[in-house]
Amino acid sequence: MRLEGKVAVITGGGNGLGRATACRFAREGAKVVVADIVDDLGQETVQLVTEEGGAASFVHCDAVSTSDNHAMAAHALDAYGAIDVLVTAAGVSHAGYKSGDQEASVKWFAKRVDYFENPANELLDLDLDDFRQVMAINLDGTLLAAQACVPAMIESG
């Protein structure tokens, strides 16, 4: 078990890469903090981890919320006493995306079927506010999670 005794905080842990990472890290011995904006999905990941004998807890976290990120770090420290690993898997590919909302994603893509024939149209027609929302989640979310968690990681060595 390569992560025995380590504490891993994983944003976007409710599905996709975040969920897979949480499950794998737990199998490797880590205690896992699953953070996600969709509570039900985050709780499902915790259930998957604990059913396999791992240790996990859930905390609600909107990746672009400074206060949510600090609450996430505080939760990890309260629950497990340290933060050793941070994985920022929270991310989206389009502004209409909401983690776990497959129906909304399908509707979003259905409106853009014609773009798949000429992908340049998506770029040329992309609304700047939509682009900024995607970048905020994907990039700002990583920065905010690091700002919240890295001080504890440095402190614990």
Where does each model-flagged region fall?
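A short, exposed helix-loop element centered on a Lys and neighboring polar residues
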Residues: A146-Q147
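Catalytic Tyr-X3-Lys loop
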Residues: E103-L143
